[in-house]
Amino acid sequence: MGRKKVARGSRKESGRVRRPSGRSLDAFAEEVGAALRASVQPEEAEDQGGPGPAALPCALAMWELGHCDPKRCTGRKLARLGLVRCLRLSQRFGGLVLSPVGTEYVSPADRQLVAQSGVAVIDCSWAKLDDTPFQKMRGSHLRLLPYLVAANPVNYGRPCKLSCVEAFAAAFCIVGFSDLAVILLRKFKWGKGFLDLNRELLDKYAACRGPEEVLQAEQGYLASTRDTPEEDIDPFDVDSGREFVNLNRPVASTRLPEDMDDTDGSEEHSEDSEEDSDECEEPGPGANGGDSNYSGAEETPEQEAQARDSTEIWKGIKKRQRD
């Protein structure tokens, strides 16, 4: 009187394509190339309401927690296009899982794992990591992404603040399936910018053999960026002795030599005036008028130097106001 045992294989798989476990990497690479060719066909790009994009040769999944704006969430867009499958919070994923709680970096050593079981990401807000129940999103192969720079409009230029599609693309590039990254990034106008922005780093990571070498490549890159720190310069500091130029305005190339010539000329003129004053002082060295003239001749260079300094400062202030 027990329940009738259902024959194996009679259940329908809901939206899942079961791949043979013994598929070789060469066969997988051929499927990747076919998927790329199908994705670049003009008919697929123009007909958004057609049969949908070509199926990817590996499974893509995500745990969606509802932290992000649905209109900006790249993971939800991929799910609407049928490229990514949404998982329940407590559902297990057997492939590679990109998670902040991972202990190893993604590396080319994960190539076979990705080809056989796919990749999953966690769609959560970077501002709510402490409130995200990572322990409920179960997986056997948790991985971290190395240092990369985001190209999405929300976090452009920020290191490690990648969106879902950028995380998928980074993992595919590192394990050696860059065509899959191109297929996903083509769905976004800014997608190509992610590959251009991180080309050097992605090539370094893809040339590694394991997670340890990926870590060394990351540390080497970060060390090289710290070796050349940017100099902190205040362009409004008039006492710094530096000359600054407004790049939005043309600057005459003869301006600096003219100023130098004028300065030299003024110095020569001051020296001539000092000699003339000395000659005038010689006829009456002991008179009261001679003493006053002598003291005035000593103070004149200092007064002229102070006048030049105040004039230069005033020019700098006027130039800053004009700019």
UniProtKB/Swiss-Prot annotation:
Give the Phosphoserine positions (modified residues).
Answer: S24
The region called Disordered is annotated at 1-25, 247-323
Q: Where is the composition biased (Acidic residues)?
A: 259-282
Which residue positions does the secretion signal occupy? none
Q: Keywords assigned by UniProt?
A: Cytoplasm, Phosphoprotein, Ribosome biogenesis, rRNA processing, S-adenosyl-L-methionine, Transferase
Question: What EC number(s) are associated with this protein in UniProt?
Answer: 2.5.1.157
Q: Which reaction does it catalyse?
A: an N(1)-methylpseudouridine in rRNA + S-adenosyl-L-methionine = N(1)-methyl-N(3)-[(3S)-3-amino-3-carboxypropyl]pseudouridine in rRNA + S-methyl-5'-thioadenosine + H(+); N(1)-methylpseudouridine(1248) in human 18S rRNA + S-adenosyl-L-methionine = N(1)-methyl-N(3)-[(3S)-3-amino-3-carboxypropyl]pseudouridine(1248) in human 18S rRNA + S-methyl-5'-thioadenosine + H(+)
Intracellular or extracellular location(s): Cytoplasm
Classify the main location.
Answer: cytoplasm
InterPro entries xref list: RNaseL-inhib-like_metal-bd_dom, Tsr3-like, Tsr3_C
Report a single Gene Ontology molecular function. Answer: 18S rRNA aminocarboxypropyltransferase activity
Q: Which residues bind S-adenosyl-L-methionine?
A: T74, I122, L145
Whether Hydrolase counts among this entry's keywords is no
Any Gene Ontology CC annotation: cytoplasm
The GO biological-process annotations, alphabetized, read as: enzyme-directed rRNA pseudouridine synthesis
Q: Which NCBIfam families match?
A: PRK02287.1
- What family does this belong to? Belongs to the TDD superfamily. TSR3 family.
- Protein's job: Aminocarboxypropyltransferase that catalyzes the aminocarboxypropyl transfer on pseudouridine at position 1248 (Psi1248) in 18S rRNA. It constitutes the last step in biosynthesis of the hypermodified N1-methyl-N3-(3-amino-3-carboxypropyl) pseudouridine (m1acp3-Psi) conserved in eukaryotic 18S rRNA.
What's the name of the protein?
18S rRNA aminocarboxypropyltransferase
What is the organism of origin for this protein?
A: Mus musculus
Tell me the gene name: Tsr3
